[in-house]
């Protein structure tokens, strides 16, 4: 305890025990259910109930094994990187990406937990993952099933459409809302609402570290503006070409996007 502990951490078990006591006494709640890491907190509540209300007072605890990822960390919001069912907090695209990026070591387990696929289907996907992991068949099926279950067929199709567009670079048919979903975590920049030469634009938005590098990447065909490859050093980035008048999308290389406002 060289650095001490917070008041919240110090009182957590006490407050949870008191909470269980009041729920038991005032509302007749007899059982508390939690993850296996909550065993001590739950039994503290049971002990408090028995001391204050008598040893014969019905009070029980039930714990469920924690779902751990292959690296041993918890699968949950307290461990960071969790997803929400609410599309306002986690968009269908983000939700889909979360599942499609699961580790090969976890994906079969998640298919069993979170989908209604038959044992035969899951075993077939497990075999495909073992033989051809680069195809990510199990991850794609997991993402498809869970996204459809939570966000419906429309949410799944939108997530797949955004995924395919960003992967291929063909973003012209995406709406502004879909672009914002897909590039929510991409680098962003702001520039003045004026026409600029492509080289100056790339440097001003810090997409390129120097004009020399910008010229080189443009000439080599590494720069895409709103989905189109631009190789002319005379090209002008015009605000009028922005998506819905809001964004110019720059792609450098295969999939390095920047959202420019």
Task: Write out the residue ranges for each language-model feature.
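Divalent-metal (Mg2+/Mn2+/Ca2+)-assisted nucleotide/phosphate chemistry catalytic cores
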Residues: 1-63
């Amino acid at each position: 305890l060289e650095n001490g502990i917070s008041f919240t951490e110090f009182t957590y078990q006490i407050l949870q025990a008191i909470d269980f006591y009041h729920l038991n006494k005032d509302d007749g709640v007899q059982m508390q259910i939690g993850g296996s890491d909550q065993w001590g907190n739950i039994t503290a509540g049971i002990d408090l109930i028995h001391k204050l209300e008598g040893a014969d007072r019905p009070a029980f605890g039930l714990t469920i094994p924690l779902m751990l990822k292959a690296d041993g960390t918890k699968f949950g919001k307290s461990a960071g990187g969790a997803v929400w069912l609410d599309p306002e907090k986690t968009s269908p695209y983000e939700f889909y990406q979360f599942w499609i990026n699961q580790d090969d070591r976890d994906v079969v387990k998640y298919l069993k937990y979170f989908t209604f696929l038959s044992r035969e289907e899951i075993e077939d996907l497990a075999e495909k993952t073992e033989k051809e992991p680069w195809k990510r068949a199990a991850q794609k099926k997991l993402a498809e099933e869970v996204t459809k279950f939570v966000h419906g067929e429309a949410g799944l199709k939108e997530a797949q459409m955004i995924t395919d567009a960003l992967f291929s670079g063909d973003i012209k048919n995406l709406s502004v809302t879909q672009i914002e979903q897909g590039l929510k975590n991409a680098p962003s920049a702001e520039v003045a609402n004026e026409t600029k030469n492509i080289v100056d634009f790339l440097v001003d938005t810090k997409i390129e570290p120097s004009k020399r590098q910008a010229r080189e990447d443009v000439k080599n065909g590494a720069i895409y503006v709103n989905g189109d490859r631009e190789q002319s050093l005379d090209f002008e980035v015009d605000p009028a070409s922005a998506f819905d008048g809001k964004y110019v999308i720059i792609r450098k290389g295969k999939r390095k996007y920047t959202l420019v406002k």
